[in-house]
Amino acid sequence: MRSSMFRCVSRAHYSTSVTEDFINSILARAQEATAKASSNALKLDKMKEGRMQNKRRNGNQNRNSMNNKESRGREGNQGERNMRLKNRSSDSVRANKQQWNKGANTSFVKNPTGNTVVMQPQFKKMQNGKNNLKGDARVEDDLLDVFNSSMEQKPVNFNGTPKSKARFQKKSHILTASKRRKAPQQQLQKVIKRPVSSEYVLEEPTPLSLLEYTPQVFPTKESRLVNFTLDSLKKSNYPIYRSPNLGILKVHDFTLNTPNFGKYTPGSSLIFAKEPQLQNLLIEEDPEDFHRQVTGEYQLLKPYVKKDFEKLTKSKDTVSKLVQNSQVVRLSLQSVVMGSEEKKLVYDVCSGMKPISELQQ
């Protein structure tokens, strides 16, 4: 039974073996497809190179026209730039449309890396978005190139000759300030000079320590005596600084009046007086001045007591106040260089023993 079953199996009417012709045909088709893809990629590269060259030429022409038309305002330059940007954007849009309108079939494009990419029509929208982004990036790059070239290009005169640089270039103080802030600077430390001070230590005074505060001209007894004699001679109108009259006839025997000599007296004329003879002059000496200036003994004023003021008032408070006032006046007047009579009169008036009208007399 089994042998009869196997014998009934029929063979296929075509050959199931793979022939060499079939393999060669497949290889030929694959080679044709790769050749077409490579040729299309080469064409696209050539088109890109041509576009780049055209862009460079247009850019150079536009730059030259911008440099030649510097006298125009900013508005004209801005309009030209806008027109150029519009043209470039329209060119990029047209190129993108041409790429996708050539055929709805799949195409092979080479990347900048050298790999082939299959372009399929179902992903057309995504690819258009990518191309638009690339076009915007190209426009931005072109703008940067134009700006850099305009900055680097030298200024030109109306004749077309390049302008000479100014000798003194104005620099921005803002940049210099920012550079100074960034640069590390050493802070200048102000040296505060303090005065030399030494602590004062109390010491018991000695004759040697007191010599530091003595004047250069020592007030000795002889010097005080000389000063007293000079004062007494001036008071007695003795000729100290003028020639004395010794009784011999002279032409110039008149001198100025001594009280006004060396003093400015407005509203008064100069008085000439005849110099008296030397033998007729009398030198006046005041013994109180002698004791006061030479020996250092001043006039001692008599102090007042309560009994002296009881004649003026009966209240005890006013009497005690008058006594205290008289003591203050006496101590202050004792060391004053004055005449004895004048000093006594001032003492009585200030103490309240005499009226003020006596000072005017």
Curated annotation (Swiss-Prot):
Residues 37-99 are annotated as: Disordered. GO terms for cellular component: mitochondrial inner membrane; mitochondrial small ribosomal subunit; mitochondrion. Residues 43-52, 69-91 have a biased composition (Basic and acidic residues). It comes from the Eukaryota. GO terms for molecular function: structural constituent of ribosome. Residues 1-14 form a transit peptide. It is found in: Mitochondrion. Keywords: Mitochondrion, Ribonucleoprotein, Ribosomal protein, Transit peptide. One of its GO terms (biological process) is mitochondrial translational initiation. The lineage of its organism: Eukaryota, Fungi, Dikarya, Ascomycota, Saccharomycotina. Component of the mitochondrial ribosome (mitoribosome), a dedicated translation machinery responsible for the synthesis of mitochondrial genome-encoded proteins, including at least some of the essential transmembrane subunits of the mitochondrial respiratory chain. The mitoribosomes are attached to the mitochondrial inner membrane and translation products are cotranslationally integrated into the membrane. Coiled coil: none annotated. This is Small ribosomal subunit protein mS46. Belongs to the mitochondrion-specific ribosomal protein mS46 family. Residues 59-68 have a biased composition (Low complexity). Component of the mitochondrial small ribosomal subunit (mt-SSU). Mature yeast 74S mitochondrial ribosomes consist of a small (37S) and a large (54S) subunit. The 37S small subunit contains a 15S ribosomal RNA (15S mt-rRNA) and 34 different proteins. The 54S large subunit contains a 21S rRNA (21S mt-rRNA) and 46 different proteins.
